[in-house]
């Protein structure tokens, strides 16, 4: 039954939930604080494979840079400076990847379209609200349903299989940092590859590496291809994300050419909203706000999920 005084708009014309509907009361009454305290993890096969591949490719790049190019070098400070720099970029990139993957992107609580919740909203007469028929929640403005996460996500930009998660309101910052650090480490690796090729050609491939010349060439060529591919992809994604933040428009909203019904923020206001606070070095730190949590498995209606 639909409460008077407002209208519930549902594309599939599902009725408003009542107390007798078969939904988990715990999920419908969960607060935003409870949602924020959970470690988020999407059990999607494709996403998990892509996430593991990302880590393996970064580890491979670190192996080639460290053991093929830097350790055999006779220039001590060249090896130390570049080794520290590349490994720092790799650690920051992988840390940003983890934060993006394990952070709730802004999921709307499931099954909150109850009569009690509707009454608590204190809606004005004639005001229209939207309900998602798939996860049975009241959709806030600019929220979209993700078929992979099976949740409505606030300010959903897109679902990225490489981080096995949606990019939304709460984890967009970490995704931006991930793309930035991968792009920087790719540029660094490409520069080192170029210098290594020059050194090997001048030395006639005799003392440029501890590996045989054919293996060295194969490792360097593969790293160059990986670096070019990663740099192109992440640089484009980084630019797209910064453009979206500055224009206060998600990728989904841009593709749908939706007319804004919200007041757009100024460019710097959008950046401060995503990265938190005025410009500082903390914007570059993926560890800000990190809390070590204990993972455990809880069985809930609809399947198991990881939580604390």
Curated annotation (Swiss-Prot):
GO terms for biological process: androgen receptor signaling pathway; glucose import in response to insulin stimulus; negative regulation of catabolic process; peptidyl-L-cysteine S-palmitoylation; polarized epithelial cell differentiation; positive regulation of D-glucose transmembrane transport; progesterone receptor signaling pathway; protein localization to plasma membrane. Disruption phenotype: Homozygous knockout mice are viable, fertile and do not display overt phenotype. Knockout mice are hyperglycemic, glucose intolerant and develop a type II diabetic syndrome. Zdhhc3 and Zdhhc7 double knockout mice show a perinatally lethal phenotype. The keyword Hydrolase does not apply. The keyword Transmembrane helix applies. Its main location: Golgi. Pfam families: DHHC (PF01529). Residues 1-50, 97-173, 239-308 are cytoplasmic. The DHHC domain is required for palmitoyltransferase activity. This is Palmitoyltransferase ZDHHC7. The gene is Zdhhc7.
